[in-house]
């Protein structure tokens, strides 16, 4: 009997108040869903951007092909480091790159000077049959021991210019240095790198010859 009376006294919720509560719940759910969707989209775009940057960071960079030097019978006075972009690398701006060399006691840092390049003091190109170390190609002797020059070896699309020396697929250039003679005595271990703005550096590692022969002033070092 009491159970019947209890059930008879229960009434379903109805009226405008209930409708307002229901609509409010729907709106809250919609707002929450919108926030989740927007957050998901943002995170997806962020992940895609980060993935692309990481891929470029891993693939981009420079490789050292070989290193040639000129000696004066007692020291290496000029250095030419042949470089090219890594396979799959994005474009590399050499004006933002830094070259470092060290013999364990002295560390030198070289940068590219676009002002001197515009005046043809630190930029050149090897013509057919030309010499890399010829003063007509690039006046290396006038360069300071804190800057590097660029000699274009191969650049089909003309991307590596004096003011904007950009390397891309297929390009080969020589980074030339006017060295401090105290660094390059015989049997000296030289280490260093060519560090681009983004990506892996080109590694420099060689030991200077035990003796410098007068009959051959140009030597291959790496």
Swiss-Prot record:
GO cellular component terms given for this protein: archaeal-type flagellum
Example GO molecular function: structural molecule activity
InterPro entries (UniProt xref): Flagellin/pilin_N_arc (IPR013373), Flagellin_arc (IPR002774)
Propeptide, residue positions: 1-12
GO biological process terms held by the UniProt record: archaeal or bacterial-type flagellum-dependent cell motility
Keywords attached to this entry: Archaeal flagellum
Source species, domain of life: Archaea
Compartment(s): Archaeal flagellum
NCBIfam families, per database record: arch_flag_Nterm, PRK08541.1
Record-stated family: Belongs to the archaeal flagellin family.
Cited function: Flagellin is the subunit protein which polymerizes to form the filaments of archaeal flagella.
Name under which the protein is recorded: Flagellin B2
Species, as recorded: Methanococcus vannielii (strain ATCC 35089 / DSM 1224 / JCM 13029 / OCM 148 / SB)
Lineage: Archaea, Methanobacteriati, Methanobacteriota, Methanomada group, Methanococci
Gene this chain is encoded by: flaB2
């Amino acid at each position: 009997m009491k159970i019947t009376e209890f059930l008879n006294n229960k009434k379903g919720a109805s009226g405008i108040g209930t409708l307002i509560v229901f609509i409010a719940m729907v709106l809250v759910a919609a707002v929450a869903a919108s926030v989740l969707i927007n957050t998901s989209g943002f995170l997806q775009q962020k992940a895609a951007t980060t993935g692309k940057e990481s891929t470029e960071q891993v693939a981009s960079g420079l490789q050292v092909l070989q290193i040639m030097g000129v000696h004066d019978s007692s020291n290496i006075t000029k250095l030419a480091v042949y470089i090219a972009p890594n396979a799959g690398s994005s474009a590399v701006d050499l004006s933002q790159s830094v070259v470092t060399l060290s013999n364990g006691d002295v560390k030198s840092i070289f940068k590219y000077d676009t002002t001197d390049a515009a005046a043809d003091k630190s930029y050149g190109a090897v013509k057919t049959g030309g010499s890399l170390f010829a003063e007509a190609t690039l006046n290396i002797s006038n360069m300071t021991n804190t800057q590097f020059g660029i000699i274009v070896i191969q650049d089909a699309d003309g991307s590596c210019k004096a003011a904007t020396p950009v390397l891309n697929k297929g390009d080969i250039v020589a980074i030339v240095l006017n060295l401090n003679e105290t660094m390059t005595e015989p049997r000296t271990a030289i280490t260093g790198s060519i560090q681009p703005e983004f990506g892996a550096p080109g590694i420099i590692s060689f030991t200077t010859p035990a003796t410098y022969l007068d009959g051959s002033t140009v030597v291959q070092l790496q």
